[in-house]
């Protein structure tokens, strides 16, 4: 919520407030945290969609829940349009999702070293 004061010489005789959308980074951080804490709910009756969680219902009101496990994206699976991760280039020093531990799924990885020669069109200028 943001507010603005109205009045003579900056006094706050009237105050107008309105709701604003939160910062995108704040929302995405919150969603990432909720996704990492998501609670698996085992549905006993899959036809009706009813479930009987073993966890506290108050806790579930503010958490993300899921009732199907995610597919294994490491392996190729045409049913979910997953090409798998085999053959992709990973970044050995990265802490992000492109790191070798995430992409290689425990299969190990090969190190590729390349040397390139390129013309840089550099010039030396004597200045002094």
Swiss-Prot record:
Keywords: Developmental protein, Disulfide bond, Extracellular matrix, Glycoprotein, Lipoprotein, Secreted, Wnt signaling pathway. In embryo, in dorsal hindbrain; in adults, in brain. Disulfide bonds join 3-17, 5-12, 74-105, 90-100, 127-128. A lipid is attached at residue 9 (O-palmitoleoyl serine). Glycans are attached at residue 91. InterPro entries: Wnt, Wnt_C, Wnt_CS. Pfam families: wnt (PF00110). It comes from the Eukaryota. Its main location: secreted. It is found in: Secreted, Extracellular space, Extracellular matrix. PROSITE patterns: WNT1. SMART domains: WNT1 (SM00097). Ligand for members of the frizzled family of seven transmembrane receptors. Probable developmental protein. May be a signaling molecule which affects the development of discrete regions of tissues. Is likely to signal over only few cell diameters. This is Protein Wnt-10.
């Amino acid at each position: 919520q943001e507010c603005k004061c109205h009045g003579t010489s900056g006094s706050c005789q009237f105050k107008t407030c309105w709701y604003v959308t939160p910062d995108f980074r704040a929302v995405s951080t919150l969603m990432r945290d909720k996704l990492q804490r998501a609670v698996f709910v085992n549905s006993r009756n899959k036809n009706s969609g009813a479930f009987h969680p073993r966890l506290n219902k108050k806790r579930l009101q503010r958490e993300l829940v899921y009732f199907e496990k995610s597919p294994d994206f490491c392996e190729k699976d045409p049913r979910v349009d997953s090409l798998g991760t085999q053959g992709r280039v990973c970044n050995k020093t990265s802490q992000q999702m492109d790191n070798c531990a995430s992409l290689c799924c425990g299969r190990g990885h090969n190190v590729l070293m390349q040397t390139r020669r390129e013309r840089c069109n550099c010039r030396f200028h004597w200045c002094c």
